[in-house]
Amino acid sequence: MKYKDLRDFIKILEHRGDLKRIKFPINPDLEITEIADRTIKSGGPALFFENPTGYTIPVLCNLFGTPNRIALGMGKESILSLRDVGKLLAFLREPELPTGVHDFFSKIPHFRHILHMPIKRVSTAPCQENVWCNQDVDITHMPIMRCWPQDVSPVITWGITITRGLKSKRQNLGIYRQQVLSKNKIIMRWLSHRGGALDFQEWHKNTSERRFPITVALGADPATLIGAVVPIPDTLSEYAFSGLLRGCRTEVIKCISCDLDVPANSEIVLEGYLERDETAIEGPFGDHTGYYNTTAKFPVCTITHITQRNNPIYLSTYTGRPPDEPAILGMAMNEMFIPIIQKQFPEITDFYLPPEGCSYRLAIVTIKKQYIGHAKRIIFGIWSFLKQFMYTKFIIVCDDDINARDWNDVVWAITTRMEPDRDTIIVKNTPIDYLDFSSPISGLGSKIGMDATNKWPGETEREWGIPIKMHDTVRHYIDSIWDKLDI
C-alpha cells in the first residue's frame, strides 16, 4: 500500500481501529510520555493528542508502537513479510547478474523495484505552505515533549536530519535526538560513526566555510521515516530506499535556504546550519537503555527558517527502558537483517535481537553447525560484518534445534552445552556505545561470545549427551486424541 504522506497513514490506522484520538488536554511535559509508555507496553494503538496543553498543534505518538504497524508503514501486512525487504536489501548490497533464463525471471521483481529509486523534485509542496524566517523563527510554538523528570529540556525525537558530504551527491537521512536550547537553536546529538556526523566531519576538515547546511524534517511519510532508520548500503540514498519501500518515487522539494532536499509532504521543516566550532553540553536525557545518559558536547544547529503545512501535526516519541518505540522498530529491523546476514553466512537459520537487550546489545544466533569451531567463526563474523553490530556486547550461538526467540530454549542450551572456560570468547578494548556506562572507558569496552552448540569430537573428549525426544508416531497419536482427553 502506498502512502503519500503521514496523513494518509493516519487515515488507514484510524480505519483499522489502530489509532486513538485523545481530546482531553494532556501536557507534553511528562504526561504524554506516561500515557504513551503505558500504551506501548500493552500493545495499544497510535495516539493522536488533539489538545496538548498550551499548544494548538496536535501531537502524534506511538506511530510505530507495534511490529504490525511498522510492517504496514512499509506496505506489508505482517512483520514476517519484512524479510522480503531484507532480501531486497541483500540484493542491493551485492547485486548479481542473472545466470540463466530462470534466474533472470526470478530477479525481475528486484529490477522492477529499482524504477522507484530516483527522487522526484517538485516546485511547490505542502511543507512550504507557511514560512517563517530570521527573527520570526520560534520552535517553542511546537509541542515538543519533555519525556522524563530529569531531562534537561524538551527534546525533538522523530526529526529526519538531512545532510550532504562535501564531495558527495548523495544526501544522508538520519534520526538524531535534538535538545532545545532556545527559540532558534537545538543541539545535534549524533554518534561519530553515523552518516550526518561523517558528513559534518568531512566538511569540517576540507573547507574553510563557516556554516554547514542542515535540515530537519518532522512528520514525513512512513516509508521515508523508516528509510531513515534502516541500515541500507552506504552507496544507496535513503530517499532511493524510501521509494523502493513505497513503490513510487519519493517527492522532494529544495529547501528555501540551501540546496538540500526535504520530503515534500513533511508536516514541519527546520532549515539551518552548524557553525564550524559552536558546540554545547547535551543532556542528560532518559535513553533507550532505561537510564539517563551522561552529558557530552555536540554541535549546535541555528535554525534560520521554519516551513510547515497548514494545520500541521507534530510527530514525536520517547525513549526509555524497553519496550519503547525504538525497541519495537529494532524488532522489525531484526527481520530485515536476517536475509542480509544469511547471504554472507548461509548456515545461520535465525538471528534474534531481544528487545529487552536494548535493541542491539545482545544477539542470539542459531546455525546448522558444519565443523568444529564453527560457532566462533560466526561470533567474529557478526561483530565485523555489519557496522550495526560493532556495539553488540553479547552473542550467543546455538544449534538449529534451539528456538532463538524462546528464552527457555536458549537458557537450556547455555546451561547444558556450554563449558565457560572452553566456550566463551572475551575480546577487550573494542568499540562500545558511549551511552553504555558499564564500560570502564567511554566508548571502549569488552565483548563476549558464547558457543552454546553441541560439541563435536575435537571440541570435547567426553561422550556427548543425546537430547530426550518422544517418537513422532506417539506424538502424532496423542495429538489426534488430545481434545478427547479434555485435559
Curated annotation (Swiss-Prot):
Molecular function GO terms recorded: 3-octaprenyl-4-hydroxybenzoate carboxy-lyase activity; metal ion binding
Membrane topology: Peripheral membrane protein
SUPFAM superfamilies: FMN-binding split barrel, UbiD C-terminal domain-like
GO CC term (a single one): plasma membrane
E.C. number: 4.1.1.98
Cell membrane is among the record's keywords: yes
Enzyme class: lyase
GO BP annotations, alphabetical order: ubiquinone biosynthetic process
Reactions this protein catalyses: a 4-hydroxy-3-(all-trans-polyprenyl)benzoate + H(+) = a 2-(all-trans-polyprenyl)phenol + CO2
Residue sites binding Mn(2+) per the record: 172, 238
Primary location recorded for the protein, binned into one broad class: membrane
Pathway as given in its UniProt record: Cofactor biosynthesis; ubiquinone biosynthesis
Subcellular location(s) per record: Cell membrane
Cofactor, how bound (note): Binds 1 prenylated FMN per subunit.
Gene3D superfamilies per record: Single helix bin, UbiD C-terminal domain-like
Active site: 287
Cofactor field: prenylated FMN; Mn(2+)
Intrachain disulfide bonds: none
Keywords: Cell membrane, Decarboxylase, Flavoprotein, FMN, Lyase, Manganese, Membrane, Metal-binding, Ubiquinone biosynthesis
Binding site for prenylated FMN: 175-177, 189-191, 194-195
Family indicated by similarity: Belongs to the UbiD family.
Complex and partners: Homohexamer.
Known role: Catalyzes the decarboxylation of 3-octaprenyl-4-hydroxy benzoate to 2-octaprenylphenol, an intermediate step in ubiquinone biosynthesis.
Stored PANTHER family: 3-OCTAPRENYL-4-HYDROXYBENZOATE CARBOXY-LYASE-RELATED, FERULIC ACID DECARBOXYLASE 1
Annotated protein name in UniProt: 3-octaprenyl-4-hydroxybenzoate carboxy-lyase
Gene: ubiD
